[in-house]
Amino acid sequence: MCRKTKSAIHRRDRCFVEGWRTVVKTKSHYDSPLGGITLIADETALLGLWFDWQPGYADDDSAVLGDSPTIGAAKRWLDEYFAGCIPRTEVPLRLEGTPFRKEAWALLRKVPYGETVSYGGLARRLELKRADGRRVSARAIGGAVHRNPIALIVPCHRVVGADGSLTGYAGGIETKIRLLQLEGVLKQTERTDVDCESIDRIWRSTR
């Protein structure tokens, strides 16, 4: 058991203390068609999801390797997504960042599957949402998108340049192309029809 020392990390037991509450974080891996994905969650929410080769995403050594209900839900979401289905599984998220980044990520989550938005378009949506009318630059939105800690579920791959160009994806442009092909935004040479209902039935039968 971790000693309840405020803000301390007790690495042997792979847990940490937030205030006076002991929090256990779990880390797991997922093999996607595009490569390995790392997931990190605490007892109540998903904290991180990224492709293993993304720069700036170091493993959290306070997390124990394993699975949890939250990570299980995230893996089910990924199964549905990579099968070419619009995911129906709800995954609780906790996005840590500045107030501005949280605003941008909240709007980003509303960009539908199979659609894209420009950095400038996302900036205008945020301006309209704000009561004070403060201007938001496309560059600031780009910074928030680049620092998104939960890829795919918070769909930063759906943000494109003003001219529709595929720019600025932390997972790499080739990955962005593959994701947008999967969603039908970009044409691909071959697509296999998938029975999304069967994916759901398989998950239910293994619970």
Task: For each feature predicted by the language model, list its residue ranges.
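Intrinsic-disorder-associated, low-complexity terminal segments enriched in Asp/Asn/His/Tyr and depleted
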Residues: 10-13
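Detector for intrinsically disordered, low-structure N-terminal pre-sequences
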Residues: 16, 22-23, 63, 193
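Compact structured core domains
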Residues: 41-90
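DNA-contacting interfaces and partner/effector-binding or oligomerization modules
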Residues: 19-41
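Structural motif
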Residues: 36, 45-46, 158
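Ala/Thr-enriched low-complexity intrinsically disordered regions
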Residues: 5-8, 22
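Nucleic acid-binding interface residues in structured DNA/RNA-binding domains
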Residues: 26-33, 85-207
